[in-house]
Amino acid sequence: MLPITPLELTPPRLQGVAIPGSTRDLAGSYALGLVVAVIFYATLLFGGSLHGYDWGSHHYNYFDWVRISLTEFHTLPLFMNDAWVTKNFLANAESPILGPLVALLFVLSTGAYIKLLLVLFTAAGFAGMFFLLRDIGVRLEIACFVATVFAFNGFFVSHLSVGHPWVMGGQLLPGLVCSYRRAVLGRGGALWLAAAINAFTILGGQHQPFIWQNLVLAFLALLWAVRARDARPIRLWALLVLATLGLGAVKLLPMLAEFADYDPTARVQGLPLSLVLTAFLASGQQPDWAPPGVSYDHGSGWWEYAFYVGPVALGCLAVGLALARRCWPMAVIAVGFSILAIEWPPLLHWMDVWSWLDGLPIWRTQRGPSRFLFPALFGFAVVSAVGLQRLWERDLGRWPRAAPLAALALCLLAAAELHAASLPWQRAALGEALTSRDHRPRPLVLGTSGVITAELQAFAPNRLVYRTRAERPGRIVFPFRYGRGAAEWRVEGPTGAAKRAVSEGGKLAVDLPAGEGDIVMVYQPRFFNAGWVTSALTLLIVLGTLIRSGRNRGRLAARRAPA
């Protein structure tokens, strides 16, 4: 059956729509993405060790602590004494302990693992955007061009250079949208793929992209349902959300318990309206770049506003946007996120939507609105690709040989501009090799009076052993918190019997009898057991659904086969 509307991201009719993207397209684009990612990030990959900015302060050590826990203790760390924001490492929004490839840390060094993730996620972003556009019906040349601009724009480069590995999750947005779109158009298995992609994002500690992509999906489902006058997009979105929550419950439940009242005070300003073109076009951008009109607060820098795409790419995208048709749902989403991301001058203060939202649940987790320009850029790229395809069919198709060569030349030129602009960022990330830290709680010996002391005897990621000495009964206070709402530690005394932990000033404290003995402390985050049970049950349900659907399709095909 021919496509009803070959260039519709959200077709008004949900039945009989052809989906031209093939497995060959996906495999070929991912292989190409791997090659281009290695070439593009060659300086970062082979020029030295990750060192600068947040790599050196904490993010490198998050990955390294996982490696140490796996290789030396053969477990995943639920507790990290020197983690930022919270020592509950399972609930830590930036913790990478449940990433889908974390087992590779058994055999790879920390730096090699992070760089491998960079290449794999970048290739996923390239392939996801390419495949999404091919599914819509966009020509190969245009899909390749737009995928290059998306996967290698300055947003990813800048955040990676300053030690924000969570940004890699943003590369999964095109694949997530593509899978959801396929599910709405009748590919049932695509819904579970979308749920898996969504869950992988949060399980790997990529918390900000997880929020952005779910906002994009929610708005897309709503607007698509309005356009199609059909509730199916919303029903499948709700099922996708439920499956995501179930698969990711092992992390999401502890996170919700930890950050239910999270409201960051370190807010940074949006992108000033006067600097929008600067962010997309200006050369010489690097971490310490400070153009007039922007002020850096709370440790922020230009990476909060770096969205370089270059003049060639921006010009082509603008032409595509001008010619696009039948893409208003995604265009509305892109415009809406753009309005959120910009800091509007006093004359346009009525457009300052962010001031209405920054105190609401979900929205208040965002440190600053400028990062919303990323989902806006994604939306504009998709809409522009449709417009460029229209231009091709209307005008460029007259030159069947010259047009593909011109498109390839523009793609290479745009990639060259992006690469040249990325080099200062890549170099800023490098430095001396970082070494593993001693993650033991400090001080190693507790107690000052000599009446009661506790000395750390054994240390593992989720288990501590203290040797206690008490001249008379008393209380010892340990250098970590009691817990949020309930005790996070199971404490056993010298005989193995459980001891009652109490809170003293928010710290964990234990009442000791006179004498000497060992106290064993086992870390148990709130809702950990409920989380992994929920995730396991959801996974079984998803697998069972896929198996049953496969059998039903097989029976249906057998009935249709000629005798």
Residue ranges and their predicted role:
Residues P3, Y60-M80, A243-G320, P369, ...:
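Periplasmic/ER-lumenal interhelical loops and adjacent helix-loop junctions
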Residues S29-L34, D230-L256, V268-G270, A331-S338, ...:
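Hydrophobic alpha-helical membrane-interfacial segments at the cytosolic entry of transmembrane helices
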Residues V309-I339, L543-S549:
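Hydrophobic, aromatic-rich transmembrane alpha-helices
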